Regions:
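A conserved regulatory-domain signal marking ACT and ACT-like small-molecule sensing domains
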Residues: 243-404
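Terminal amphipathic helices with adjacent charged low-complexity linkers/tails
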Residues: 41-44, 50-56, 233-253, 309
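Glycine-rich beta-alpha junction loops
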Residues: 43-44, 180-182, 229-231, 235-240, ...
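Nucleotide/pyrophosphate-binding catalytic subdomain
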Residues: 1-221, 386-387
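Short hydrophobic alpha-helical runs that function as membrane-insertion/retention elements
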Residues: 173-177, 231-233, 303
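Short phosphate-binding/catalytic loops that engage adenosine nucleotides
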Residues: 34, 95, 229, 300, ...
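Acidic-aromatic/histidine active-site loop/patch
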Residues: 224
């Protein structure tokens, strides 16, 4: 019997009706000859009683600082409740199931509370239930340190749980259930005509996820890519075949699909800020790379970096603006920060080596009076920095330009 991982997101487990649909997916997998290992997120989204954001709000309302260790213990509760409820639903439908915490499933992590990394999975803890034909319903998002402290894997960490279990248990594939029919060519809230991408390469989906598409966590893609573990993005609320994420070459049949052109998709990230450090006439105590090294030490991630003889230009998360400004002021640097920016990225392995794609993007945006403040490209992506007020229009323009 082939083992599969089925991960259900917060919307999929939010109500009795939704959970019944999820249970049908699990039962259907068993009827098709698969053995499902289930991973669940916390119930619902922000504002609902057991959602992660709601639990964080509870802690913040106390007005007292909660340690990272204790915060992880608190916010892991949502997944525990969800696992117990889902296991109960399965048992009520005649499927022998058991709820397991991250610890009970053998997910061992480091002690980087709030964003822990999985060190290993002690698979015997899951296999002993599989051997009894009992479906494990495992809490996503959480693990445990060597010393027994509960940890969480960061925002979207249930995807990571599904991927590490798939890798450790040598699963046939991982199925990620959400509320859309698969990975779309663009955000369907912006592009009504956005299409489902039926198949996509690991690298492309990693770039899409890293650039703002919220269908799957980029770390989950990295884990799957290392072991060639297929991932399928599916809709709990439909029978759409979804999007399959695998490794394939340029000349594979999957790249010849009629609904795909030069690009695979478009993603965007809001709340970016552009930092310009001016070196004309000297610049305080900065030795060049020193500031970038210091930002890394501070845990501030930089993006879209361009280095010139007279200036450095890069972007940071808008939440980091004040810390960046303080550092530059301490170093007596000449600098400016442009806030309220968004990064819009086009993704596609087939743009590699194709001349004129950047020029085509800039022409299309210019025709629509969208100012571009910065660009960056790699072998599979081209990104532009625009004002946030122009980001939606930029996505629309580029989606139309490349006929996605």
């Amino acid at each position: 019997m082939k083992l599969i991982i089925q991960k259900f997101g917060g919307t999929s487990v939010a109500t009795n009706e939704n959970r019944n649909l999820a249970v049908e997916k699990i039962i259907n997998a068993k009827e098709q000859g698969f053995f499902p290992v289930v991973v669940v997120s916390a119930i619902g989204r922000k504002g609902e009683p057991y959602a992660t954001d709601t639990l964080i709000q509870y802690a913040n309302r106390m007005g007292k600082k909660v340690s990272p260790r204790d915060m992880d213990l608190l916010i892991s509760c949502g997944e525990t409740i969800s696992a117990v409820i889902m296991a109960s639903e399965l048992n009520a439908r005649g499927v022998d199931a058991v709820a397991l915490t991250g610890e009970q499933a053998g997910i061992i992590t480091d002690n980087n509370y709030g964003d822990a990394s999985v060190l290993r999975v002690e698979t015997n803890k899951v296999y002993r239930h599989i051997e009894r034909d009992r479906v494990p319903v495992i809490t996503g998002f959480q693990g445990v340190t060597e010393y027994g402290d509960v940890t969480t894997l960061g925002r979207g960490g249930s995807d990571i749980t599904a991927a590490v279990l798939g890798q450790a248990l040598n699963a046939h594939q991982v199925e990620i259930y959400t509320d859309v029919d698969g990975v779309m060519t663009a955000d369907p809230r912006i592009i009504n005509s956005a299409k489902v991408i039926r198949s996509v390469d690991y690298e492309e989906i990693f770039q899409m996820a890293d650039s703002g598409a919220k269908v799957i966590h980029p770390r989950a893609v990295e884990i799957a890519m290392k072991s060639d573990l297929p991932i399928v993005i599916k809709n709990t609320f439909s029978d759409s075949p979804g999007t399959i994420i695998t490794r394939f070459k340029k000349d594979d049949e999957t790249l010849a699909m009629g609904d795909r052109g030069l690009l695979t998709g478009i993603a965007y990230l809001h709340n970016r800020a552009q930092v310009v450090i001016d070196y004309t006439g000297g610049n305080g105590e900065d030795s060049g790379d020193d500031i970038l090294d210091k930002l890394a030490e501070m845990g501030i991630s930089i993006d879209l970096i361009n280095i010139f003889t007279d200036k450095k230009v890069f972007t940071v998360d808008g939440e980091d603006c004040e810390r960046v400004a303080r550092l530059l002021e301490e170093r007596k640097a000449k600098f400016s920060i442009k806030k309220d920016c968004s990064k819009v990225t086009v993704i596609g392995n087939r743009i590699r080596g194709v001349p004129g794609v950047m020029a085509r993007i800039l022409r299309a945006l210019n025709r629509n009076n969208i100012k571009v403040y910065q660009t960056a490209d790699s072998h599979a992506t081209i990104s532009v920095l625009v004002k946030t007020e122009d980001a939606k229009n930029a996505v629309i323009v580029l989606h139309d330009e490349f006929k996605l």
